Amino acid sequence: PNTLDIYAYLDDTELGMHRFYSIGGGSIEIDGEGKYVEEMIYPFKKFTETRKYLEENNMTIPEYVLQVEGEGIVDYLHEVYNRMKTTIKSGLTKSGKLPGSLGVERKAQSIMNKFFIDGSMILNKKIFAYAYAVSEENASGEIVVTAPTCGACGVLPSVLYGLQKEYQFPLEKIIEALMVAGLFGNIVKNNASISGAEAGCQAEVGTACSMAAAAC
């Protein structure tokens, strides 16, 4: 895994060192201490518990997220969605080879152009191109939203952006969809894993697909 060593010095004397591992999914492990466990702010770990609470209190998932996270989550998710859209639009404008020795060609722009030319620009093909655009920006070291990880960053943005453009959903509905998606991603992270390093690519992309499905 990606590793960070931090050394402490006083003058020229080394006082100590800590080693940190990035094990994927936003989680870290401290050498000799095991996995760092973040404090859970949500009161329920399983969705069965969450659903029971929602039914007993006649609440929707977005209302529950607002209750736990506070109103500040709305502004934050506006930033998140703006970044998702920016990344898609940026990725669609670029062509050429991605960085690295494999010489992989970008595909998002050519996919969009091909579908426009042959008149078959249906929604699932647009979403296909949007997902490529985000993933290729990630492969180029550009800014993406980890949803839930860099490796799966193309799924949720492409679905939300594609559906909003196609059906003209108001922005408020997209923000609520992000709340739902985030809750489901958090449930997976706390009960299983969203880390490709820990559980393979299916942990990342499978979770992203679940988040997108829940958001819809």
Labelled PLM ranges:
Residues 36-38, 102, 162-163, 168, ...:
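Generic alpha-helical propensity signal that fires on short helical segments
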Residues 1-117:
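C-terminal regulatory domains involved in ligand/effector binding and gene-expression control
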Residues 71, 75, 79-186, 190-200:
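Accessory "access/gating" subregions that flank catalytic or transport cores
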